[in-house]
A protein has these predicted regions:
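C-terminal cap of thioredoxin/glutaredoxin-like
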Residues: 13-16, 54-65, 119-194, 200-205, ...
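A near-ubiquitous, low-amplitude feature marking generic local secondary-structure context
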Residues: 26, 30, 34, 44-47, ...
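Short hydrophobic/aromatic-rich motifs at helix boundaries and adjacent loops
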Residues: 31-35, 69-73, 130-132, 193-195, ...
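A short, charged/proline- and glycine-enriched loop
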Residues: 36-43, 197-204
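The substrate-binding groove and active-site-proximal loops of carbohydrate-active enzymes
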Residues: 48-49, 209-211
Length: 410
């Protein structure tokens, strides 16, 4: 398929998939079907017995049942297949340390055994896996309600907001009180004035891919965090998973797009008009970012400001504006919005050195125990994965600045 036609089709299909109007219509249809049949509002929960996130999610089931007029069906499921979780060993290690920190933040004690009455024998796991697949997912710790999936504690606020909007809360919130949820999304503290560094300024290492929707959500916040706390910023580009030989099956891609859309709405960011940059567009983008980082080095910029501007412009173009970075005009638009001209674009595309840099960054990321993006770390503190963990990054910055203990939850 010609690249230009592919970009057009990508914009159209992604726009339809992430359309708020179509999402709201689907929700109304589910609600109408429930009312016409007189059935209960059913929340299906997929519990993976050996999953730390499932241990946390299961701990809030009694709270959800007490707060909402819903029937909860709990199904045991096996771990995701390799196509959905291609680096299982690192996923397990990351999940264990991340879930401990997440539990401390929310003040939730994880269950040490499956929910009462849940069968976890081989046949039950197989039935749960079949139901999960039929409903369109692949992970544990997943809540499914009337056509939409919500992952663990991190998306519980979206689920509860929807339940409350449907009038399913047993005790509705007072007018103007806002939505009260069991695990509110963490917020950044933005301490003012920020603490002064103890000697050397901390450095944020940011592992970035240009095909990651979640990276688009993270990059602006991360840039502002570094500036606010006076941290240096090292931008480390890596190729997307699918361009590193790691599969990304359709159910996973679909969930990521839909989840990114609702998170983008919460953060006030545009998202949904997508020109998928997989392949040559991403390679051209990384070349341009590396050229910008070389300019930063010459100019003595310790915050990677030009490289960050190019990466942010690329991500906005790919995921919010539908700009085809595979075309000369598209890449030039991206460059110009970041302050670079056509000569810089030509120089960047003539230099293939970015490939060795991206590979070195990939190996560094793996050595830190992670494989996906967005990932980041402060100095030599453990690396973090996911735009939902920016609050932990801020905690680590405060630790480096001498204002908090490691893993602080305040």
């Amino acid at each position: 398929m010609p690249a230009r036609l592919s970009a057009i089709l990508s914009r159209q299909s992604s726009g339809a998939l992430t359309s708020p109007a179509l999402r709201d219509a689907r929700r109304r249809l589910h609600g109408l079907r429930r009312r016409l049949t007189g059935g209960a509002a059913v929340l299906r929960y997929s519990h993976q017995p050996d999953d730390p996130y499932s241990a946390l999610a299961a701990a809030v089931l009694p709270r959800l049942e007490a707060r909402y007029r819903i029937r909860i069906e709990t199904h045991a499921v096996p771990p995701p297949v390799r196509a959905a979780a291609p680096d299982m060993a690192r996923l397990i290690d990351w999940s264990q340390r991340d879930a401990r920190r997440l539990a401390a933040h929310h003040g939730i004690t994880p269950l040490t055994a499956p929910p009462p009455g849940l069968a976890t024998d081989a046949q039950s796991l197989q039935r749960g896996a079949q139901l999960r697949a039929r409903l369109g997912h692949y992970l544990g710790a997943m809540f499914h309600f009337e056509g939409e999936w919500y992952w663990g504690l991190d998306r519980l606020h979206h689920l509860e907001t929807r339940l409350q909007s449907l009038g399913l809360a047993r005790q509705p919130s007072s007018p103007g009180a806002g939505v009260d949820t069991s695990a509110p999304p963490p917020v950044l503290r933005w301490l003012t004035p920020p603490p002064a560094p103890r000697g050397v300024r901390p450095t944020i290492h940011f592992y970035c891919s240009l095909r990651s929707p979640y990276t688009w959500l993270a990059i602006g916040q991360l840039r502002r965090l570094a500036a606010h706390y006076g941290a240096d910023l090292s931008l480390q580009m890596v190729l997307p998973m699918v361009m590193r030989g790691l599969p990304v099956p359709w159910p996973k891609r679909r969930y990521i797009l839909l989840d990114t859309k609702r998170e983008a709405e919460r953060l006030g960011l545009p998202f949904g008009r997508i020109a998928d940059p997989v392949g040559a567009p991403t390679e051209r983008g990384i070349a341009l970012v590396q050229h910008a980082l070389a300019l930063d080095a010459v100019r003595g910029h310790q915050d990677s400001r030009t490289g960050m501007a190019v990466a942010e412009s690329f991500l906005r173009g790919a995921f919010a504006k539908g700009i085809d970075a595979g075309s000369r005009d598209g890449l030039l638009r991206i460059a110009e919005r970041a302050g670079l001209d056509a000569a810089a674009v030509d120089a960047a595309l003539a230099d293939d050195a970015w490939r060795a840099v991206a590979e070195a960054n990939r190996l560094d990321l793996l050595a830190r125990g992670l494989w996906g993006v967005p990932s980041f770390r402060v100095d030599e503190l453990p690396a973090l994965w996911g735009q939902d963990r920016l609050f932990m990054l801020e905690q680590d910055l405060l630790t480096a600045l001498g204002s908090a203990s490691p893993g602080a939850t305040t």
